[in-house]
Amino acid sequence: MFFTHPVLGELYPEDIDWCVDEAAVPFHASRVHICLAEGGEDAPSDSANAGFDWIAANWKQVQKLIEQQAFEFYRPYADAVATVPKFAAPNELWGTDRLVSLRVYSVDDFSVTLRFDWQEDSDPHEVTFYVERGICETHSVDG
């Protein structure tokens, strides 16, 4: 069973989520794994669909929400690795990012997973930024 999303195409069920691998999204050059979380048996939830629509229409605002946490990941990395470019402000990170995945619950509850061009090739880590109640106060490093 599949659900056809108007932007993402065919989504497959995974537990209670609806997912797509390597989706082309209108707001980023990367092909992205996307999960619209906590759906029903036949389709993603209305709140997850609305959340994805909001993210797609407001990607610059999403970047603003997560950029301070991204900079907190960047600073110790830049201090430890001499080849990492030196950025003075959080907004300078954009353009060095690759969107890996999105997990969307609603307009103000979602996670964004990124990898950055300046990360060393031997570094397997991806960084997930958590937006909860419209605020990003945490991130985690996976890999």
Label the model's feature ranges:
Residues 1-25, 89-143:
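Acidic, proline/glycine-rich low-complexity IDRs
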Residues 1-84:
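Long, contiguous N-terminal structural blocks used for assembly/anchoring
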